[in-house]
Amino acid sequence: MNWQANIHKLPALLQGRLKNDLARFQEALEQKNLDTVFKAKTLKTLCLVWGASEFVATNCIRWPSLLLDLQGSGNLFRAYEPNHYVKSLAQQLTNISTETELMVVLRRFRQREMVRIVWRDLAGWASLDEVFRELSQLAEACLNSALACLHYWQSQALGTPYGSISGKPQSMVVLGMGKLGARELNLSSDIDLIFAYPESGETRGAQRTLNNEEYFIRLARRLIRVLDERTEEGFVFRVDMRLRPDGDSGPLVASFNAMENYYQNQGRDWERYAMIKARVVAGDCQAGTRLMAMLRPFSYRRYLDFGAIESLRSMKAMIAQELRRQGIKANIKLGPGGIREVEFIGQSFQLIRGGRESALQERGILRVLTLLAERDHLPYYAKEELCAAYVFLRRVEHRLQAYRDEQTHDLPTSTEGRVRLAFAMGYRDWEAFASALEEHRRRVQEHFEQLFAAPHMDITDQMAQEKRLAEVWLGGELREASLAVLSAAGYRAPEEAVQTLMYLRQSYTVRALSAQARIRLDRLMPLLLGAVGRTEYPEQCLQRVIILLETVAQRTAYLALLAEYPMALSQLVKLCAASPLIARQLTRYPLLLDELLDPRSLYQVLGYDSLAEDLKWSLESIPGDDLEQQMELLRHFCQRQTLRVAAADVTGVLPLMKVGDHLTYLAEVILKKALELSWRHLVHRHGRLQSSTGEQPEESGFAVIGYGKLGGYELGYGSDLDLVFLHNAKPGDPPSEGKKPLDPVVFYSRLGQRLIHILQTSTPSGKLYEVDTRLRPSGVSGLLVSGLDAYRGYQCMQAWTWEHQALVRARFVAGDARLGAAFTAMRQEILGRQRDPIKLRDEVRHMRAKMRNQLDRSQGGWFDLKQGRGGIADIEFIVQYGVLAWAHAHPQLLEYPDNIRILEGFAQAGLLASEESQLLADAYRAYRAAANRLNLQTHEARVEEGQFRQERIAVQQLWSALLEDESAK
């Protein structure tokens, strides 16, 4: 063989050892009389691989047939199928009967496959993902094979363990933690394991009885020895059991109940972090699935756990302290900008959000980072930089460990070691490699510091004002001094602020706080007081924020959120200062505090399509049959999006007309999803209606008609939904197809009831909307769901004029589009009929007078924006009158259901002068804007009598001209 052809490609410093290794290999081949014909791919990469890995060279020299076998079988040149290791190992273990034989087979198998994996990695034939995957599959195959053999042999000798409750045979469950659990095992990694068994009990079938704990402890010790003990054949995998409950001082194996009790009552923050990657890797997988379901809530809390940041920061500080103590600086795993920092970034989001966003319950860090970017929790550029750095660092780690199959993460200090690592990484020299490494680590460190940098909460490090504010909160200042400090901080009535703080400090909630919660509250308060002092009305804002704090203080994660994220605190103060309605909403539903983290999304109001996509995406994480969780998520979604609209509204980002639009879009999206859930529920219980044309609500023969503010795109905060339900069932239509069939009319009635239930039922997260169905034919005495023909007949023959007025603002909003189109055509037919103008004017005037007498609260120097003379209702009645009076000659007036566009239509048709139309539209907008502002301040829609005087006079004049003057058009 001509080995010399490629030696010159190595750095000169590495060539001497390589020449020596090649000579020894040649000698070993000749001694064994082995064929020395190697494939071109093997020869081309041999010098590269051996130059970078003494481990590969040594094993090829010791077992010269190994390389020939790997290339002859083709295994060296291809990735394995997922079950290759299991099948191959099973064949080799067929005839063994002792632990000694098992240990020999496993070690030789491991050495052979490790040579193959390292070769493919260093040669550039395997991606990092392939290396991770195959190393993890190799470990699992060895674990499962060893456990199966040992369990069989031990049960033959000591009997089979049985559960005392189930009476069934018991098997051990092995959890893989860390890199093994995440399927990210490195080239010379320990495997972190936890052993468990389902139930307590005793063995059967042997002379001596053992309890299950003793049985499985013996089995665990044998398994560890078979894998971990170093013999002349080497080892299989080093086993680390320190992640088990109570670590080295805890039992080697624990029952499921003991595991659950430990993590519920004693589990520490770092154990939550470790459990993220836990996975069943060997033993009884079915029982293991139950165990993982029991343990999942320990890592993934149902609420947003912002305390995780503080815990991970503490863990990182402990690691850094230990590295300093040992004098280690160049550790690519634990050092600054290293592998662990990338993992901490991803896993911090998992700990915080994973309970709410089950899609984040992934183990692999690259997948987690990608999901975080997709969900806008992490900027895309940050994801790209972190993923690139992680891949680079893991490749460095593999090359460090490939050299001698040693578990090391320290960069070499010797010249030869540095030359070898740079060469193995594909760089011309150490300086070029070190520069690339430093750039990756710098980027990781920047992202890590941005997320984990401790906020300036240490009172001793605060500027003077915050120190003094802390003393005010803690009660360390005399009253006069406290008043002076608060006054200097911007408070106009510091006495009132002192009373508010005293109320909170002495409240039962604060006195009952845990030590950790009290520390977090004490850190937060000086920052909070400073931020509130900078608002326009600090005392008012402080009262609102204090009420919220008292509500959430027991959930320390929220205190951590506000303390850890200055932006969240800033937005909270800003919104509470602007609107008591928003403050009240945040207090009732603290989960919304998460929305304060990112002002970009907080003030970014979504359109209809984006809302629908966002809701669909959110519901994908919930099982389709879990209606309770679906209802909860709908409420969270509605509250979150309403908060965004309100935040954009009070800060002037969103104009008034857009507020109504977006609140209407939100209601429509929720209506459609609620109808879909209702339809699925009915179909599941009673089967699909044979008369419906498909599986979805859009083909159901059921339509939801929106009236009033929903129909007119004018929903406000807390608006009811005025709904009418229609169906297209015909007499004689067959019942539904299920085991509990329903007549179509009954089916549709149940569908309407279920929809109202989903929208209106109060849950721990509140309700979605109040639903008003009184505008249906015959009102509360009529059927909840009407057939389209019956509805048409009612509108033609029985409906009052006020019901036709209401029809002006009616439109199809959800359900069967064909039925919706039929309703739209019918609406145009009804509204487009010619009416007696005198009778119409009289009936509209009479209804308006009746409403005003009952509802107008214009008294005592106040004007009712809605019902007062010249107010909102007068404009709405003018619009409705105009449509009913003129649409027969101007059908274009029926195109839109909202007042502004109808007024524009009046002007375009010459029915009103442009100035008159504009005057009404401007007054309508001004009234609604004022009512909306008052709503945000939780005030009634009334203003001082002197406001809007010109607008009111103008509206009344137009009212008189159109509806009082007998010569009106």
Curated annotation (Swiss-Prot):
Q: Which Pfam families match?
A: GlnD_UR_UTase, GlnE
Identify the SUPFAM superfamilies for this entry.
Nucleotidyltransferase, Nucleotidyltransferase substrate binding subunit/domain
Renumbered residue ranges of the record's region Adenylyl removase: 1-456
Q: Where is this region: Adenylyl transferase?
A: 466-969
Entry's Gene Ontology cellular component terms: cytosol
Keyword annotations of the record:
ATP-binding, Magnesium, Multifunctional enzyme, Nucleotide-binding, Nucleotidyltransferase, Transferase
- Kindly report, in one word, the top-level EC class recorded for this enzyme: transferase
- Give the cofactors, semicolon-separated: Mg(2+)
GO molecular function terms noted in the UniProt entry: [glutamate-ammonia-ligase] adenylyltransferase activity; [glutamine synthetase]-adenylyl-L-tyrosine phosphorylase activity; ATP binding; magnesium ion binding
Q: What is its EC number?
A: 2.7.7.89, 2.7.7.42
Question: Which GO annotations describe the biological process of this protein?
Answer: regulation of glutamine family amino acid metabolic process
Name the catalysed reactions: [glutamine synthetase]-O(4)-(5'-adenylyl)-L-tyrosine + phosphate = [glutamine synthetase]-L-tyrosine + ADP; [glutamine synthetase]-L-tyrosine + ATP = [glutamine synthetase]-O(4)-(5'-adenylyl)-L-tyrosine + diphosphate
Q: Which NCBIfam families match?
A: PRK11072.1 (NF008292)
Family under the similarity heading: Belongs to the GlnE family.
Q: Which PANTHER family match?
A: BIFUNCTIONAL GLUTAMINE SYNTHETASE ADENYLYLTRANSFERASE_ADENYLYL-REMOVING ENZYME, GLUTAMINE SYNTHETASE ADENYLYLTRANSFERASE
Explain the purpose of this protein. Answer: Involved in the regulation of glutamine synthetase GlnA, a key enzyme in the process to assimilate ammonia. When cellular nitrogen levels are high, the C-terminal adenylyl transferase (AT) inactivates GlnA by covalent transfer of an adenylyl group from ATP to specific tyrosine residue of GlnA, thus reducing its activity. Conversely, when nitrogen levels are low, the N-terminal adenylyl removase (AR) activates GlnA by removing the adenylyl group by phosphorolysis, increasing its activity.
Identification of the protein by name: Bifunctional glutamine synthetase adenylyltransferase/adenylyl-removing enzyme
Native source species: Nitrosococcus oceani (strain ATCC 19707 / BCRC 17464 / JCM 30415 / NCIMB 11848 / C-107)
Q: What is the lineage of its organism?
A: Bacteria, Pseudomonadati, Pseudomonadota, Gammaproteobacteria, Chromatiales
Q: Which gene encodes it?
A: glnE
